[in-house]
Amino acid sequence: MKKTLCLLGLMSCMALLPSMANDDCWKPAEWPVLKHYDSEHLKEVALPLGGIGTGTVALGGRGELRDWEIMNIPARQYSTVTIGNDAPFFAIYTKAPDAAPQTKMLAGPLYDDEYIHYEGRPVNHHGLPRFTHASFDAAYPFGQVLLTDEQMPVSVRIKGFNPLVPGDEEVSGLPVAILSYEVTNTTQQPLEVAVCGSIRNFIGKDGSQFWTDWKGDMIPYGEAKNHNEYRSDDAQSIRAIQFLTDGVDSLSTAWGNMCLATDAVAGVSYRTCSADNAWSASVLDFWDDFSDDGVISNPTANVRKSVGKDQDPMASLCQKQVLKAGETRCFNFYLTWSFPNRKAWSKSIVGNWYSTVHPDAWETAKEVISRVGEYERQTLLFVNALLASSYPDVVKEAALFNLNTLRSQTVFRLPSGHMLGWEGVMDRFGSCAGSCTHVWNYEVATPFLFGKLARSMREVETEYALHDDGSMAFRVTLPLQNPDPNYDVAADGQMGCVMKFYREWQLSGDNAFLASHWDACKRMLGFAWKERGWDGNCDGVMEGSQHNTMDVNYFGPNPQMGFWYMGALRAAEEMAVAMKDKAFAKKCHTLFLQGSQWMDENLFNGEYYEHRITDPKTFEFMDPASPDLPPYQLGKGCLVDQLVGQYMAHLCGLGYLGDQTHIRTTLESIMKYNYLDDFSTHFNNMRSYVIGHEAGLLMASWPKGRLEVPFPYFAESMTGFEYTAAVGMLYEGMEADALKCITAIRSRFDGSRRNPFSEPECGHHYARSMASWAAIPAFIRFQYSAVEQTMSVARREGTWFWSNGYAWGTLSIDAGEATLHVLHGDLTLSTLTIGDKRYKLRRTLPAGEQAIIAL
């Protein structure tokens, strides 16, 4: 603290007088670690902290906060300011008796490629002293950064998380990043320690608007008359800075409020404004003040010339404690926010669910601080249950780490509660609007972990995308209203929606949900039978023009659309039986038998299923050697996800859609022809998601001859498609091959080259990557029906995490007995099938209870 203080500065120091203990603050438990990233594998690590549909800020691999994406749009690598020392940061002050104080930024060292720039500042905080060593531990959503430095008398573990509790979308949708700085005194004497967070008030600056100065620097803008207020509540043990604005348009997507809070009461000091930033003096003034004694105060009047002029004043919140020799203490901070004006792909504001529940970041901070221990316990219960299971670590990693997509700007919830999503997100805007059906068909994390949200997506599809004639827009418009008359249909997307509706009905057991949407489901499937449609002659085979997830139209029967169609017929048959619609059930059954047999007899070539191309006008089969073949087809290619419909059928409990031996042979062929141990000699004319000496599954291979112009993505490799093949292998007992594929994927996301918490396709945090969760139920053949009140698993010794979207827990199996433990929600079961034996339960197990079955 500087010697000359203004009145506000004196007032801020009074909090230091009573004590510096803060013994009642939240003390994080020991967090699990699934994956460790050493100092050579940190550069791309960015773990998103935020709730479902709230946006996030990421905890970087070396401890910095990066990717500030809390204002309704993506903002990769956006730090709220022009690259420099003004970006948000946390710093630590230490003072040992009879020793000079030391101050450093709480982050690890610069990387080797961060040393060159036309102004010598290619990275934020380039001029701040840093710790010399960093590493990162993760078990999503828990991230931990360990900072050490031989010159510092402390080691620091930065812990960051946001509550993630399957089955509880509200707790999992809190707009908060929780940070705890665990500081350990590594000396043999007492130590003064202060930790301080500093953030400029960037309300209005969401990273979408920049101007370029004379040097070429990109200067973000949008802030207007922003100011910061210090707030406290002794009853709830909270001190905070609230970030507000008087000038940003209240209809701007970047309008809202934020809060940086601490649960410390003693030893708290703060700044609500900053010095004039000419020649970067504001950081200089802060650093001098903080480094003096670990206590801060607002700049004096003659220094803070920018007050009233500075549109984005920097605020700082600091807490100071005394650590005994060898002692560890926690310095906790909570960043909360509310930015209600989401537009997504609409021209008008559609809003956010979370901001209707949490409109005031200050109130949110109070709520979170009062319940943080409970939120941590609930999240740990989930993560520890999964990590303690007997699944291979790489399966846990792929399933767990890809849940980040649910918290990214890919996903949002409308004020009505409906969940929607982009396909993924680019650096500054969403990628491919409309909850695209043929992309979201692949992911299964939402239905198995957040059933209510999955059902809301089915409501959107049936109520706002489906036309009277049964055609469905595969991209829904916003605001939600009558289906868009200018729309496109997708065969795979629409057939998948029938299967997904069946899945949500089965997992929820809500017969009213089915009854109220049964007519819509019939129209969805029935559209395939329109004249000159996908199956216009109603023979169980799709011959028509089939738009699909390859962003082209396939002409003629092919396995990708064919198995989606077979799955939709099976799902519709089961729903029709439940609705006592005998005629429709019979029709679906007949078409399924015809279509399945035809595909096995006419598309299976002895190794895999192929595509028989038809004339787009006549629907007649064409000679594969004809020069008049339409472009962008599959033909005789071996497609990585040709069995995607079978993948979904297994997950839904609908059985085999084709000959079982053909299914297995096809997966063996995919492994034989599509898997590459090394991509360094592979030619790819499109996007490269696998490069050099990395391994993975190709989208398509051509053992029987390639078309001159195949479908666009044939030479690529994308994780969501790879997971469907790997999961199919699990169902066929090809465990070694499945794990080889999944390991190849996750090895590419090693923190050095790619972010372990974002698997991209057409954009970061791509929705299809959540197909990785399917390996969890597939590994133990998990099936659950709330309609029939049944659960079944393979008889496989070990402890296995299970979930159905509403309840979750573990099932432990050994030679003599099985223990079914419910950890969250209520589970009603009539029978439990383990292997080939059925056991009657006829009871409801609430959370915390278990059933023991003698085998």
Language-model features, listed with the residues they occupy:
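Beta-strand-rich N-terminal accessory domains
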Residues: 22-110, 248, 389-390, 398-402, ...
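Non-catalytic C-terminal accessory modules of carbohydrate-active enzymes
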Residues: 64-66, 72-78, 83-89, 96-159, ...
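Aromatic-rich carbohydrate-recognition surfaces in CAZymes
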Residues: 91-97, 101, 105, 111-116, ...
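Acidic/polar, glycine-enriched structural segments that form the non-catalytic walls/loops
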Residues: 22-31, 36-41, 45, 144, ...
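Short, solvent-exposed loop/turn and secondary-structure capping segments
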Residues: 47-48, 57-61, 67-71, 81, ...
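Active-site core of glycosidic bond-cleaving carbohydrate-active enzymes
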Residues: 427-471, 515, 519, 552, ...
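The feature captures the catalytic groove of carbohydrate-active enzymes
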Residues: 170-172, 180, 267, 284, ...
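Bacterial Sec-dependent N-terminal signal peptides
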Residues: 1-23
